[in-house]
Regions:
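Basic, low-complexity terminal or inter-domain segments flanking catalytic cores
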Residues: 2-4, 15, 24, 150, ...
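Core structural elements
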Residues: 138-149, 166, 196-198, 248-260, ...
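Short acidic, hydrophobic short linear motifs in intrinsically disordered regions
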Residues: 240-243, 252-265, 292-300, 459-471
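Intrinsically disordered, low-complexity regulatory segments
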Residues: 1-139, 220, 426
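Metal- or metallocofactor-binding catalytic centers and their adjacent structured scaffolds
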Residues: 214-254, 443
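Conserved short loop/turn motifs at secondary-structure junctions
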Residues: 1, 81-82, 158-162, 245-254, ...
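C-terminal or mid-to-C-terminal helical accessory/interaction module adjacent to the motor/catalytic core
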Residues: 112-194, 245-246
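Alpha-helical scaffold elements adjacent to nucleotide-binding pockets in ATP/GTP-utilizing enzyme cores
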Residues: 15-19, 65, 88-96, 116-120, ...
Length: 694
């Protein structure tokens, strides 16, 4: 009789089944099989917060099949993912199948390769009850907050609303940033730059005014001051008074953890956190690679550990030496400090290729799209982390002109090191530092141009998915498995919307945030939430009781809820409408954008006297190739975005391909984007060009 091995997904089952062979039957639970009921609280608060788990709707048949398979097999091994959620799935499966959770029937795989599966199968263990309790505590806390807060929001804001323990903090962070920008008062300053070049030499460069000649720092704050300095510099010689040379070593970034992978994929490819994790899950669970069969290409992707296995480091360094040469290999074992608060969180490695010797060029013959992009990113980042530093020769020049001191700096790369393979993407558009021409102390320079540019200090930018995830991580909010769901949830609930990658609160999100800030300050307090996460980590480490942790929170929360009911008795928060420049054709009043249960729509501001309304459509700025109408964003019945002409039904042109701002160089029509290329849809044009990779 074979042994039954249960994993979460069919893809994972297929890969593991290939390695285990005939003595095992591998099947999938399709994720969680039990949870708290959707229609009731499902927690006995008066009896030690005992959960009332039920089989998830639609999973009854699957559970029945798993029980039947278990009876036909010689034992069961639970091989769900190596994290809290995976441990919880295994605990529930053990409960359903009548397995002893303290028996060695739990196996985990940090990587789904022949070696990784063999290693996992060789070390079966009991279910980690502390890990399960941490998951159970998080689930109950989220249920208690959501189930108790939602009815309150229904009464005070709008029916159908809900609030979450962690999501509410994320909305607050986004709203705080918006208010910071709204209240920002810019300060004027001026940059005074001299375009110089050595007398009789080639190679001009720019130096910036930095101080007075005696070294006192100088800040130019208005035009009058700037004009005075320009006048004082008129006719002055520019002489190099000091040259400083040095060497600068740039170290590579550490391998990815969940948060940094999501941030980098967002910056590099515009991926949402959910899209990144979907592609990473595929790479972890296994894909068919020519010459290798079905193999998991990366280690487990939900981690905040920077630990790397010694054998993976060795394999990477061997490949680096063969590909780039021995001088490109880092000669020491780099160690990075993980943010992990507990040993339980540091159980995994960082995200790395399971086979460092398998470069993206070989893999991309078998995979494409998101998975190919993400594998190249993960492979490159990990390999770079095992490469030598980039070494730069730096030069800094101090230049005196009259009573003022200018400075210029630059560098030349003397050894490219890890940058031969990888450069980390960034959100900041930093000024690029370039090399200076050969310079000597005492040298007189020729002034080609002197400019004074007015500038103003800038507010911090709106959050993107990448920067919000960074802020959540920096503040200790959420954990690797929660970053993507947090963002998905606040967008799906209509509290936040994306506008050109920027995250903005909606009027509904602002109204809910106001209520939360005024009535439930602890729930949206960043430090309080971070402390709660730490307490749950302590539960995970087996150093605190999960029931007491929940009770300590719930006692205070219940009092806040009672007080909020008193504070807002008879009151209701109005969700502000968004004004438009559209006029109601029925009564002449302005039309406004309202938020309803099913999203935004345009309605007459004279409601309820005038009930004129229509769906909200977004204009892409592109024009229809058939009749010149506006190309609008629309959604299919299944929620898929497509683009259609504003003159529908007179014109029924529609496409799944996104219109872009760039115009056709041949006929001036709107271009559309499809699978790595831009094309013109105007009949008879036929223009097509590949999208350049950045």
């Amino acid at each position: 009789m074979p042994k039954l091995v249960i994993v979460e997904s069919p893809a994972k089952a297929k890969t593991i089944g290939k390695y285990l062979g005939r003595g095992y039957k591998v099947t999938a639970s399709m994720g969680h099989v039990r949870d708290l009921p959707a229609s009731t609280l499902g927690i006995d608060v008066e009896n030690g917060y005992t959960p009332k788990y039920i089989t998830i709707k639609g999973k009854q048949k699957l559970v029945k099949e798993l029980k039947a398979e278990a009876k036909k097999c010689d034992g069961v091994l639970l091989a769900t993912d190596p994290d809290r959620e995976g441990e919880a799935i295994s605990w529930h499966l053990a409960n359903i199948l009548g397995l002893d959770p303290s028996a060695p029937n739990r196996v985990t795989f940090d990587e789904i390769t022949k070696k990784g599966v063999k290693e996992g199968m060789a070390h079966p263990r009991a279910i980690n009850i502390d890990l399960f309790n941490a998951q159970q505590a998080r689930r109950e806390l989220d249920r208690l907050v959501g189930y108790k807060l939602s009815p309150f929001l229904w009464k005070k804001v709008r029916r159908g609303l809900s609030a979450g323990r962690v999501q509410s903090v994320a909305v607050r962070l986004i709203r705080d940033r918006e208010l910071e920008i709204e209240n920002f008062k810019p300060d004027e300053y001026w940059n005074i730059d001299a375009l110089l070049n050595p007398q009789g030499e080639k190679g001009e460069f720019t130096a910036r005014l930095a101080a007075t000649a005696d070294g006192k720092k100088l800040t130019v704050t208005n035009k009058q001051q700037a004009d005075g300095i320009l006048a004082a510099l008129d006719g002055r010689d520019y002489t190099i008074t000091k040259i400083e040379k040095g060497k600068r070593r740039r170290q590579p970034s550490p391998p990815f953890i969940t948060s940094t992978l999501q941030q980098d994929a967002s910056r590099a490819f515009g991926f949402s956190a959910t899209r990144t994790m979907r592609a990473a899950q595929t790479l972890y669970e296994g894909v068919d690679i020519a010459g290798h069969g079905t193999v998991g290409l990366i280690t487990y992707m939900r981690t905040d550990s920077l630990r790397i296995a010694a054998e993976a480091q060795a394999a990477a360094k061997t490949f680096i030496a063969e590909r780039w040469g021995d001088n490109y290999v880092c000669k020491t074992a780099r160690k990075w400090k993980s943010r992990s608060a507990t040993a339980a969180q540091d159980a995994h490695e960082a995200i790395r290729p399971s086979m460092p010797e398998l470069p993206p060029d070989e893999v991309e013959q078998s995979i494409s799209g998101d998975t190919a992009k993400l594998y190249r990113l993960i492979w490159s980042r990990f390999m770079a982390s095992q490469m030598a530093d980039c070494i730069q020769d730096t030069v800094s020049a101090s230049i005196t002109a009259g009573d003022y001191l200018f400075r210029a700096s630059g560098f030349r790369v003397s050894f490219d090191g890890f940058t031969a393979l990888y450069e980390e993407s960034t959100d900041d558009a930093k000024k690029k530092e370039t090399a200076l021409p050969p310079l000597e102390e005492g040298q007189t320079l020729k002034l080609k141009k002197l400019t004074a540019d007015q500038k103003f200090t800038q507010p911090p930018p709106l959050y993107t998915e990448a920067t919000l995830i960074h802020a959540l991580e920096e503040n200790g909010i959420g954990r690797p498995s929660t970053y993507a769901p947090i963002i998905t949830t606040i967008v799906d609930r209509g509290y936040v919307e994306k506008d050109q990658k920027k995250l903005k609160t909606t009027p509904l999100g602002q109204a809910v945030n106001t209520v939360m800030m005024e009535q439930f300050p602890d729930i949206v307090n960043v430090k309080f939430s971070a402390d709660m996460e730490k307490k749950l980590d302590v539960v995970e480490a087996g150093q605190a009781d999960w029931v007491k942790t929940i009770d300590d929170f719930y006692q205070g929360f219940e009092k806040s809820l009672e007080q909020a009911e008193k504070n807002m008795e008879g009151k209701r928060i109005k969700v502000e409408d968004i004004p438009t420049d559209e006029i109601c054709e029925k009564c002449g009043r302005p039309m406004v954008i309202k938020s309803g249960r099913y999203g935004k729509f345009v309605a007459c501001s004279g409601f309820p006297e005038c009930r004129n309304a229509h769906p909200l459509v977004k204009d892409t700025g592109g024009l229809c190739p058939l009749d010149g109408g506006h190309m609008l964003v629309r959604k299919s019945a299944k929620g898929r975005v497509y683009y259609g002409c504003s003159n529908y039904p007179k014109c029924n042109y529609m496409t799944w391909d996104e219109p872009v701002p760039e115009k056709c160089p041949q006929c001036g029509s709107t271009l559309f984007k499809k699978k790595g290329q831009l094309y013109c849809a105007k009949e008879g044009c036929g223009f097509v060009k590949a999208i350049e990779k950045k």
